[in-house]
Amino acid sequence: SDVYKRQFMSWYNEAIFYHIYPLGLTGAPKHNDYSAPVSRLNTLLPWIDHIREIGCTALYIGPLFESVGHGYETTDYKKLDSRLGTNEDLKNFVAACHEKEIKVIFDGVFNHTGRDFFAFKDIQQNREHSRYLNWYCNVNFGGNTEYNDGFSYENWGGYNLLVKLNQRNPEVQNYICDVIRFWVSEFDVDGIRLDAADVLDFDFMRALRRTAAEVKEDFWLMGEVIHGDYSRWVNGETLHSVTNYALHKALYSGHNDHNYFEIAHTVKYLQNMGNLDLYNFVDNHDVERIYTKLSNKAHFAPVHVLLYTLPGVPSIYYGSEFGIEGKKEKFSDDSLRPALDIKDYADAVQKNPCTALIAALGKIRQHTPALSYGSYAELQLTNRQFAFARDLDGIRVIVTVNNDDNAADMSLPAGNCAEYIGTLTGRKVPAVSYTHLRA
């Protein structure tokens, strides 16, 4: 069939995401002293028009909730971080996005909590007698940590600041499902990106999926998964999507090494997992900016053409549409999460070639259902040139990219089409049995 998952059509199949790390973008202090709320989230309201202008239709924003530092050591799942403002501010922000027809998903940090979370504090206070002992993994009163609590516990990633929740405990499951219900009723959120989904318990994710189905039609669950067979997570029982780190790696190294075989092989490998709508990205708050990563800055264009046209849901990390740089440092991700003022980029779509390209690709994708639902077929592949087709209901979209310093002629089978239209240029190319395209 020509139809690529079309029977499951939902807003997220056609979405183009924008990704904001709010504590960074708003320039919030690194440490939360839990003092009176400061409404920094409101400074992001002017970004909403920009998000629409570059063609994005959904926003992934987070972490948002009360925490002591970078946002992933949660203190309170039901309260906006004081450094960002009040729950009322968040409610208004989501409503403003919805007014512009932008869906909103929050970061859900459910693998671990911070040490200031109420259940952990209860264990510190009541020790062996705490009713929350089984909310965490491997609490051991024969051990200790650098915090000198008089007990040890399982953490995430070697950081004792992040205390691993016991997701098999029905009380924990019920509590987190209740958090999701609260986020929907209080803020009208449209989905959740699950932090550290690759270490979440599968039964726990099944419980989240059941809750997602109850709270809102088309409520989207997307998980952070680095390695592995993505179909273990993306299926009818657990998550709708996961982060496509495999394609992320291939997109930059396939250009840096002049090796389109790596990208084509990765796409084939992903296709073999089934029709998964993966969350595609070239950078985010944890990895170096694409503009920094690319040896040849001119490759910004073919990288993003592929991001927007290969199977999956594309995402842009705030600031990367302007071509900003950001190098990962050894002990800090601050350089990847800068404060920016949208006023400094007022005419970016007109004046910045990177932004103009992203806006043009956004428009093309929005008006080309084959890029969301079409089947995928590789047409031509060399180290330096790559062509593929997306087919849907008799419409064929052909994408050609070239990573060489010189223009290249590519001969491609024209299929049954009478003519081709060069989408970025608008010029028509008559179709013969083979069509020559200069990439």
Which role fits each region the language model picked out?
Residues 1-7, 435-439:
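Conserved small/polar residues in nucleotide/adenosyl-binding loops
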Residues 73-81, 112-147, 236-245, 331-335:
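Aromatic- and acidic-residue-enriched segments that line the glycan-binding/catalytic groove
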Residues 118-162, 250-266:
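Core domains of carbohydrate- and sulfate-ester-processing enzymes
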